[in-house]
Amino acid sequence: MSLNVKLHPSGIIFTSDGTSTILDAALDSNIHIEYSCKDGTCGSCKAILISGEVDSAENTFLTEEDVAKGAILTCCSKAKSDIELDVNYYPELSHIQKKTYPCKLDSIEFVGEDIAILSLRLPPTAKIQYLAGQYIDLIINGQRRSYSIANAPGGNGNIELHVRKVVNGVFSNIIFNELKLQQLLRIEGPQGTFFVREDNLPIVFLAGGTGFAPVKSMVEALINKNDQRQVHIYWGMPAGHNFYSDIANEWAIKHPNIHYVPVVSGDDSTWTGATGFVHQAVLEDIPDLSLFNVYACGSLAMITAARNDFINHGLAENKFFSDAFVPSK
């Protein structure tokens, strides 16, 4: 069975056999539509069903209002007939192929209380292509976890990852207690549609915890291109000592178009900077977001709160781009 899937407004058409999800069918056809977690948790792959029938698995993201508007999640919906969808298509990703690469642990640096910065070296013949902001799956002993790439494309070709230690986490135990330098690992990627869009709007980057990793990659890429858009970086942490890098402050000192505000959400008597929820700090400085693009990476709760509050302060819904951390299943 071959079913046609037509995307609007691009007019792109691909086929599905009805047994794979709409998202997987699209990616198998090298058609890149919005997605992130691929398991129905983050909601990035939300699309509007214009016509046709789909079989959708249960998910916790779509509201009754979403369903009434015809919204589906392409990562957990399968086509039952020819269908038409209102969903973004990204030709910028058409030249990028997801592959599995061998790599070695070139270095590991433990910073702060619970963060490890990994540098992975690929073979000289393995040239991974990605857009700043995308993520990879790190594969160790048959297990995998998704991590955002923390450095811009180019450089020495290494892949930088920022990993937070999770209490009783199997993968965390491997990374923090068992990994050895030069150990052979594998990565699969790149994945995701989290990258900087090419327009002239000023940018707000919103990061929670190690959500700073893709922000670092995207800002580095903007600097490398000498992009002069106004960039506002807000990075939230529970306490002042949790900030594990000073590079954002260095950017702000060196580049007049880059502005940086670290925000502490917890009780820290030594902290003299911005406090509270990191997205609320944005609204205190920029109460009207109607002329901005926002890129947010962090917990699902942070992403959801930021999206709702930012839209209420003028941000166009299609100008909010996010990559939410979701728990491993």
From Swiss-Prot:
GO terms for biological process: lipopolysaccharide biosynthetic process. Residues 2-93 form the 2Fe-2S ferredoxin-type domain. Monomer. This is CDP-6-deoxy-L-threo-D-glycero-4-hexulose-3-dehydrase reductase. Disulfide bonds: none annotated. [2Fe-2S] cluster binds at C37, C42, C45, C75. Keywords: 2Fe-2S, Electron transport, Iron, Iron-sulfur, Metal-binding, NAD, Oxidoreductase, Transport. Residues 98-197 form the FAD-binding FR-type domain. Pathway: Nucleotide-sugar biosynthesis; CDP-ascarylose biosynthesis; Bacterial outer membrane biogenesis; lipopolysaccharide biosynthesis. Coiled coil: none annotated. GO terms for molecular function: 2 iron, 2 sulfur cluster binding; metal ion binding; oxidoreductase activity. Participates in the conversion of CDP-6-deoxy-D-glycero-L-threo-4-hexulose to 3,6-dideoxy-D-glycero-D-glycero-4-hexulose together with CDP-6-deoxy-D-glycero-L-threo-4-hexulose-3-dehydrase (E1) in two consecutive steps. The detailed mechanism of E3 is not yet resolved. It holds the Pfam family NAD_binding_1. The keyword Transport applies. Its EC number is 1.17.1.-. It is an enzyme of class 1 (oxidoreductase). It comes from the Bacteria.
